[in-house]
Structure formats: structure tokens, C-alpha cells
Amino acid sequence: SKRSGKAIALHDLLDEISVDAARYFFNSRTPSTPLDFDLDLAVREDSENPVYYVQYAYARICSLIARQATAGNAVAQVEALDTDLLSAPEELALMKALAQFPEEIHLAARDYDPSRINRYLVDLAGDFHRFYRACRINGEEPALLAARLKLADTVRSVLANGLNLLGVSAPDTMAGGGFLYESKLEAGEIDQETAERAAKEKAEREEQRRQKRKAREKNRPLSDEADDVR
């Protein structure tokens, strides 16, 4: 653990972080590279935590598609779209990233290196967030709206497939951390009261984790057994 520089038993680690975070972080390095597990990073609920960042991108797209479906804008088949309308730099970057997915999977399998998938998903999530900030998916001309919605849905599918390969869940919704609700507030998806409530809940969860950690460190020595994480 980077927090203390000591070993920590795997079952103790899973008391503090989710299985999803553990799997994502354990797969974040090449097989030949030692892993210093950053426990503080693994419990963060913001864009610095890679698994949270990727899962949030997926959940945000699910929310977007559900809202558009309620408004009568279902995701269309590619054949019915005018993809030439997708010409903004952020749209082109996102399509280029999507096209790289099959090759990344091939290379990860060839080299026995799942960390390639980790890095790809983080990069793809970043490309989506930049696209989402720059390109409106609401109130646009119908043909452009349909094309952008399909692009977002394709990102959703690739994120789900990539997370599944890593054994990490792809949640349709997420309990709000600071990053998630700050982004939603900026996009006008929630109000200030909801964002403040989410921030308070996040602080309470962090305090609970600190208390559990203090109690465990006080009552139980750190183990150096075979199942330790270093």
C-alpha cells in the first residue's frame, strides 16, 4: 500500500474498496511491473480514480439515452443516420478512439497484458467527456441529434464490453461522488441542493472508511502472509 509502505491483507483491502476497484487496479500494470497499490486513490470518487471515471462515463451515457428515449428520441440504426454530420474535432476524436478497440483487445490478448484495456477505457472515457462538453445532445436538429446519440451509444457499448473483459461492473446509475455531481450540476442535469446533498453523503462515506481503517489498524496487525498486497 502506498499509504503506509507496508503490506495489507487482501481481505482487509476489500473491506475498504470495492471488488471493481481491486480488479481494475490489479490490472493496471503490465505483468512484469510491480504494483504499489494506491489505497487513497482507489477509494476516491472523482476523475483521478480510473475505475470511477470509466464507470461514470458509462452511467452518464445510460442516463442520457434514457432521457432522450423519454423525449421520443430512441437510438437509431446506423443505416438510418447521416454520419457525415459528425465533423466536430471532438466527434472525430471519439470515432477514431472507438475504431481502435478491436486492435487493443488483440494486443492485450497477444501480450497477456490486460493493462492495455485499462488504459484504453480511461482514454475513451476522457474522449467521451470532452465530446459531451463540446457537442450538445439536446435540442439539436433531428439528424444531428440522432447521429450524436448513436455515437454516445456506441461508446456505451464499448465501455461495457471493455469493463466486462476486466471483470468490472458497468452500472447504469452511480451513487454520487463529487466529480459526478459537479459534472451533472454544470450540465444542468441536477440542481444545487442535490449536488450539496451528494457532497455531504460523500464526506460521510469517507469518514466511515477512515473510522473503519483506524479501528482495524489499532486492533489488528498488518499481515505479511501470502495473500498480502504490497
Enumerate the predicted regions with their spans.
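Non-catalytic interaction-recognition regions
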Residues: 1-197, 202-213, 230
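Short linear regulatory motifs embedded in intrinsically disordered, acidic Ser/Thr-rich regions
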Residues: 219-223
